[in-house]
Each structure stands twice: as C-alpha cells, then as structure tokens.
Amino acid sequence: MKQVSIIGGTGSIGTQTLDVIAANPDRFQLVSFAFGKNIEVALPWLNRLRPELVAVLDETVKEQLEAVLDYSPTVLVGEDGLIAVATADQADIVITAVVGAVGLRPTLAAIEAGKSIGLANKETLVTAGHLVMKKAREKGVAILPVDSEHAAIFQCLNGERRQDVRQIILTASGGSFRDQTREQLANVTVEQALNHPNWSMGAKITIDSATMMNKGFEVIEAHWLFDVTYDEIDVVLHRESIIHSMVEFNDGAVMAQLGMPDMREPIQYALTYPSRLEIKGGERLNLKQIGRLNFAEASFERYPLLRLAFEAGRAGGSMPSVLNAANEQAVDRFLKGEISFLEIEASVEAALQAHENIEDPSLDQILESDRWARAFVASLSLAN
C-alpha cells in the first residue's frame, strides 16, 4: 500500500487526488494532509480518510477544525505545518497541489527527506527549477508530473533517449476566450473568464488558462523536467483537449498521449507509476464519437503572456520568479475587480521590465524577488 501526503488538499487537484485515494482503499492511504482554511471541503474527507497529521493556515482555523472533527489527529499551522506534512515519515509520495510559490519550501523539504514528488504545483519549477532539479538529482528523488501536459510528455518519453528528441509540443485549449479578439477582451468579466470550455479547475488556473500564462508556466516547467531548451518547445492550440501533448523525434515520428480531459488520469498515473490502474467511473476515449481533432497556431500577438514566459525562461535567474509572482498578484486583483482582464498582461510586463535580473539566485533571493514583484503589482496604478 502506498502512503500519500497532500499539500493543497481542498483545491481542484487536491480533491481529485482524494477521489483517487478513496476509490482505491486497498492501494493508497492518506497519512498527512495540508489545506488553508476551507473546512467545509476538508472536513468530510478528513473524517473519511483520517490522516494522522493535518496542517492548516493558522490557529483560528485549527481551533475551528478541531471543534468539528470526529477524530483527533495532530493539527499544525502555517509553513511549519506544510513542511511537516511534506516530510511525514510514513509518506512514500507527496502530491504538491497548493497554488503558487507557497509550495516551494515544502517541495524542497520533501525532496530533502527523500519523498517522491507528484508535482501539480508548477510554480515550484517556474520560480526555482534550478534548485529543485539539482536537489532531486542529489537525493535520487523522482519528480512525477501531475498536470496533464507534462504527464503526457513523461509517458511519450518513457524508454526514449534524450538525444533522439527534436521538440516537445505542448497543447493548449485556448481557454475561456479562445474565440474572441483582443478588442473583445477589453471588457470581459470575471464570471466569463472562469467559464473554461473543457476542464474543471480552480479560479486562478482558469484565469491563467484564459491568458495562456498557464501554458507559459508549462513551457518553463517542461524545460526543467525534460532537460530541453526553449527552442525545443512549441505550443499549439488544440481546442478539444484530447491530445494532451506530443513529442517529435529526430526521425520525424511524433508520439502523442490522448485521453478524455479528466485530471484523475494524470493524478492516478503519478500515484501508481510505473503501473497503471483503471479509473473507476472514468469516461473512455471514443475517437469515432469525437470525429475530428483541430489545431491552430498559439500566436504571441494574441497571447502576450506566452511570449513573456518564453522570454523570462530564456533570461533565467530571478525573472521566472518575478513572472510568476507578478501574475499571481495581477490575477488576484482581476478577481477582486480592481483591474481589467487585459491589465493582467500589462501588470506582468511592467514588473518584468522594472526588475533587475539576478542570474543565479539563492532560495532567499528567489523569495525576495517574489515579494518585490507582488508589492510592485499591488501598488501599480493602471488606467482602465
């Protein structure tokens, strides 16, 4: 039986991971669990799966949770709690599903403790890929991608030689506004932006999908996970989200991984690797019913944040950390109604232009760059 820890347990990836664990009680056991403050979502899962260690945002949430739990786990708070969950002695694998740069320290701690990582927190590699991959190599730790695109590439590369790879092709749905012009984007609402055509995801990642920032993060993540240059990564629009990504080899062969848009598939693959297990209640792919698959160019002109991600990735150093933090802050401001949809892009670009890159940043310098970018965007005054 595989022992599992989850960081970010009440978000979209976290709850779907819990679905997989609950559906396979003979294969998986939840030993530790971290979430912020969403007790309403966490409580039934905790009472059902009964992990011994729980971490929450602060003392207030701890008191509220302990008052309603029907068992008595150890409950910790704050970043120390996150790290305790990530390094729990019993855990074989840690699913890092927390959103944002807050996942960086717990992920590094889990690697240091020798835990396999099911990586759903792409910001960890975006902000500190050089530190994370170096530490993983030193500790002999497997980094298993949980997001659908990198899980697809991981499977396509299984058994292949790095020198035979010509390029990685990431597919993108195009997000909520894929059929709208940039002129039409000027006045879109938060509600419209959160209406993703294919995937059920959390609010931030749904906005990131609409701006293509999410795909930009995946470009940087692919660079670190698969040891490819940015010239060896391409992005193509694929509105059906059936082909999750592709790898082109030197002989012209292209290998693709297909499946229904169901996040339980890459989550379960990370948990069971190198084995496979039937997804209970999952919908099987029926190509005859789908009929056709469509592809189009992912234009930098249409999606400026994708361009900025390539630029920040190539620049390296502290630039990707600024890219991520500026975007997080800008998306938060958009969700609060403080800025328009297009001003997300303007905020991120302004932060990158204002930042003085640190070429080989330490962890502290990465976190300081993160803080600087958030403060910069929070104080930015933009004309609507």
Swiss-Prot record:
Catalysed reactions, semicolon-separated: 2-C-methyl-D-erythritol 4-phosphate + NADP(+) = 1-deoxy-D-xylulose 5-phosphate + NADPH + H(+)
Positions bound to 1-deoxy-D-xylulose 5-phosphate: K122, S148, E149, S173, H196, S209, N214, K215, E218
Record-listed E.C. numbers: 1.1.1.267
Residues the record lists as binding Mn(2+): D147, E149, E218
Enzyme type, top EC level: oxidoreductase
Binding-site positions, NADPH: T10, G11, S12, I13, G36, K37, N38, N121, E123, G202
InterPro entries: DXP_reductoisomerase (IPR003821), DXP_reductoisomerase_C (IPR013644), DXP_reductoisomerase_N (IPR013512), DXPR_C (IPR026877), DXPR_C_sf (IPR036169), NAD(P)-bd_dom_sf (IPR036291)
Pathway: Isoprenoid biosynthesis; isopentenyl diphosphate biosynthesis via DXP pathway; isopentenyl diphosphate from 1-deoxy-D-xylulose 5-phosphate: step 1/6
One of the protein's GO biological processes: isopentenyl diphosphate biosynthetic process, methylerythritol 4-phosphate pathway involved in terpenoid biosynthetic process
Family the UniProt entry places it in: Belongs to the DXR family.
Biological role: Catalyzes the NADPH-dependent rearrangement and reduction of 1-deoxy-D-xylulose-5-phosphate (DXP) to 2-C-methyl-D-erythritol 4-phosphate (MEP).
Protein name per its UniProtKB record: 1-deoxy-D-xylulose 5-phosphate reductoisomerase
Organism this protein belongs to: Exiguobacterium sibiricum (strain DSM 17290 / CCUG 55495 / CIP 109462 / JCM 13490 / 255-15)
